């Protein structure tokens, strides 16, 4: 009975510390933070935005903006990009989309953003590769806990989806090559050289920014259909965003904002040095053990000699 009383208060409560970014369907809007059947409606407003036209296999951007935000004392707010709200099999990947990056520095459809004190609006952006020809709805959803995380979680979703019509790619449309994958991660303090392959492009202009900041143009060099440019290093583990304006015989195109996240250097192990150090420790242990054993044997030998001498004298 005591155990049940201890467990019951937490069964419907939210996890104020979040679950981390990941690939989750809408069901996780409650199940990850408690019982999905005990969700309450969030008072926040969720709006999803995307171009109404995209081209098969090319990149486009989708954003979710949440206003009237209420969240836990930790400031975490979970954002979902979804292909429907059925609760299962409703990630963008299930509908054929491929997530290239998001503005929080990952490649997942679910991200947790840290909301500052007094902040009531926040936007998360995704760069995605379009699926096959057809019409595709996309939804935005959120979940969050109460102020102290002690009660049932809140879940909210966009009232209407944005419907994207995916069309065949026009023959002369300036575009990034299908095989191009923008870098998503790098180490703090390192500049990044981006080598960008294109098709039907004869001019490129690239600009970068800190999220929400002013854009700065960078020099671009070309080699046929390949274009190269450098993105500056950051001194902190923060993200920068960049995009390219592409010109050619067809209509001018602008890529989505790509996010490049800087991370602290990861601690690495020199396997050879670790192996040699381990062997040295084993040998040192064996030498110490043999030395102790030899000392013990010598001591036992001296005791036996003393006993023998006493017996002879007797």
What is each residue range found by the language model?
Residues 281-297:
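Alpha-helical transmembrane segments
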Residues 1-5:
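Sec-dependent N-terminal signal peptides
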Residues 297-314:
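Cytoplasmic C-terminal tails of single-pass
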Residues 108-113, 192-196, 226-230:
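Generic recognition of long tandem-repeat/solenoid scaffolds
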Residues 7-185, 203, 224, 237, ...:
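Sequence context surrounding c-type heme c attachment/ligation sites in exported
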Residues 187-188, 244:
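Long, charge-rich C-terminal accessory regions
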Residues 63-67, 190-199:
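Short edge beta-strand/loop segments characteristic of extracellular beta-sandwich folds
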Residues 200-257:
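Alpha-glucan (starch/glycogen) binding determinants
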